[in-house]
């Protein structure tokens, strides 16, 4: 009986592994939901539209006219492919997971500050992007604001 149980466990592990490896990543598409399940959200309002930015592979974006029904925008503000090269130079091991965005308006522009880091290390950076309007898909990379140093703990 024990041999049969062990055999079953190995077969199950093999099936699970094959299934996980055989999966293909589906491209993200625009969709609408009444539950905005996001991390570290920050919201801004412009011209009758609420814009919610959040942690993700790049800066995620959802929009709403009523704050009840949210539309996910694929690629967000700064999608996985739009992350500036300086982030990888400043943060060794950075894997495009941008977190804790914050937004503010100054001098007739919108500004988003965001964090880049490598899990388990003390090297991080804060970047800044800007745009004259929230509705644009094009944001300007304003570069790095500050970085931490690996050899310092404070």
Go through the PLM ranges and name each one.
Residues 20-154:
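Carbohydrate-active catalytic/glycan-binding domains of CAZyme proteins
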Residues 5-14:
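Bacterial N-terminal signal peptides
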């Amino acid at each position: 009986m024990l041999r049969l149980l062990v055999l079953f466990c190995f077969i199950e592990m093999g099936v699970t592994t094959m299934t996980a490896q055989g999966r293909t990543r589906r491209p993200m598409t625009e969709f609408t939901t009444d539950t905005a399940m996001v991390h570290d959200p920050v919201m801004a309002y412009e011209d009758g539209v609420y814009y919610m930015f959040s942690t993700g592979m790049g800066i995620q974006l959802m929009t709403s006219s009523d704050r009840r029904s949210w539309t996910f925008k694929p690629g967000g503000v700064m999608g996985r492919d739009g992350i500036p090269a300086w982030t990888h130079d400043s943060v060794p091991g950075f894997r495009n997971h941008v977190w804790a965005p914050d937004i503010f308006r100054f001098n007739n522009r919108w500004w988003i500050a965001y964090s880049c880091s490598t899990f388990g290390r003390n090297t991080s950076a804060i970047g800044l992007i800007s745009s004259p309007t929230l509705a644009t898909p094009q944001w300007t990379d304003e570069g790095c604001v500050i970085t931490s140093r690996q050899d310092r703990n404070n």
